[in-house]
Amino acid sequence: MKKLSLILGFTSLFAIGHASLSPAITTDTAHWYMEHSYDVLQYKLAVDLYANYATPFPKTFSAVENITFRVDSSLNSIKLNAIGTSLGIDVVGLSAVSFTHANDTLTLQLDQTYNPGDEVEVEIHYHHLDVADQGLYVSNGFVFTDFPPEGARKVFPCWDRPSDKATWDLTAKVPVSVRLGSNGLLADSTIVGDTLWYHWVCDEQIATYLITWSSSNIWNIHVSYWNNIYSPDDSIPIWLYKKATENVTTAVEKIPLLTDFYASKFGPYPFTKIGFATVTSFPWGGMENQTMVNLRPNGYTDEPLIAHEHSHMWFGDMITCGTWADIWLNEGFATYCAQLWLEHQNGYEVYKNKMNALANSYLSGNPGWPIYQPEWAIQTPSANDLYNVAISYNKGACVLFQLRYVLGDSLFFEVMNSYATDTNFTYKCAVTEDFISVTNAVTGEDYSWFFDEWIYSPNHPYYENVWEMEDLGGGQFKVILNMNQTQTNTVFFKMPIEVEVDFNDGTDTIVTGWNDTNPQILEWIFNKYPSNVIFDPNRNILLKHGTTVVGEREKDPSGFFLYQNTPNPFREITTITYATDIDQYIVITLLNQSGKTLQTLVDRPFNRGVYRFSLSGENLSPGVYLCRMDAAGKSRTIKLVKR
């Protein structure tokens, strides 16, 4: 009877009465965000894929979609995303009485005006056109979908934004040889002759870009279980879709251990299934479809990839970025979680080396924009920009590393756990300000300054630090660190710092301080002779340039210093830094190579401190110049090169 009822149910989806209009279809793509005055509760799709697994492997299919939504404000029509070059709308039914399809927007006219709180169901009969659209992939017996960031609209009409989650129900008709997986749990599968119907149900809320089906007529399925550490009587199935020749040993061994580890840090595994599949012609390394991760071919041997994608079940799937401006809450978190797994398995040094590599990758590939781009909350960027590895992945992960350094391990992991288990966000969405609020609530302090620097501002600090030593007599020595951030295209970065002081007896020590003004002098007194100073010896500030202290300068009775300009050589502008340890009058002049004064740059009294100014090269011809600092009857000179 179950078999019969499923067949009749599937047939009825394709046979309901409906209204029909001739749609106006255009190839234009809508880049604006549509009016949205409803909340989608469920997408229910019945799709006929039977013909897609054999030559010539067509990309066409027919489908019936039922969408249930709750009204937020009175309406008599709704708009959905539906790409006109991919989808042809045939007829609509239930509460939808007519439609227009233009500019990649499907507008459904409803049978009446509905009021806030009303639940409405519409039905859409449509077909997918025989086009390659980077949403549906069909080749050599593989049929799968891949939707990030907004590709679901190429396969089924939807409101295709990450902030509106819904449940998912899929019934798929395929040849009996096909293995097909989707989000959630397999509710039923029925074979009649050479035809197989799969019925997948995802009761947890899911964003449209995380919806998928993956299938192949050459797959085997390896099923194992994770013993739920939070509910030992409930085991979670692990479904691995694979070619017969693929080795899944690493995945079978590591996925339960990964789940244990992430659950211990971030709370219970949030779903009822763990699923992975390897697919051909895949455009990414992996895609974190909710409970049904797609991997590149042979991805089962790639432990870091599996660790990254599996952590998305907490960060990205259970808690989804509320806007694309918050994508780092998905990708930065998953990138960092994979390194936490590395630390758990192999120790801190291995983890730190990998974090250094991520930081170096960012520093060499930084495109110059901040992690949080406000316009991305309104206008979807290109996939290349949104998924920029340097920013969304590597810098995002490094920011979490630095937050751990600032907070300390105990508070940091409390923040992460509190965020991951907060019912305001679980199975919903979160934005960057939500994570900041959790950080502030857990710590009892306001860390907005940290996120203002590292998330909302572009780039990173450039340090030009100089240390000096003063013999105080009586076996006492003062180390003076003149700190100077020279970046000109972003903010000042306030951070706690560590400084290693090496002594001439072969010993060393680490001292700490706060770099909270620019420029700044920090001092420490020791009872043995300092021989060297190293700024940030453990590279806790991953995201920076100029980590090497410029040099050692012993105290001079005149008590003033002129440091080499940066950059040098220069074209448009260069920064000149100077310092005085006593209150005195200072004159700085620019000269040509013959010693003729061209310009007086500084001429006034100064209090003790470190100072800097910018010198424009606009009116300087290319060549070599001298910059001289005069005070207390003595002078210091540096050489400047103008390109």
Listing of model-derived features with the role each one plays in the protein:
Residues 389-481:
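Amphipathic alpha-helical substructures
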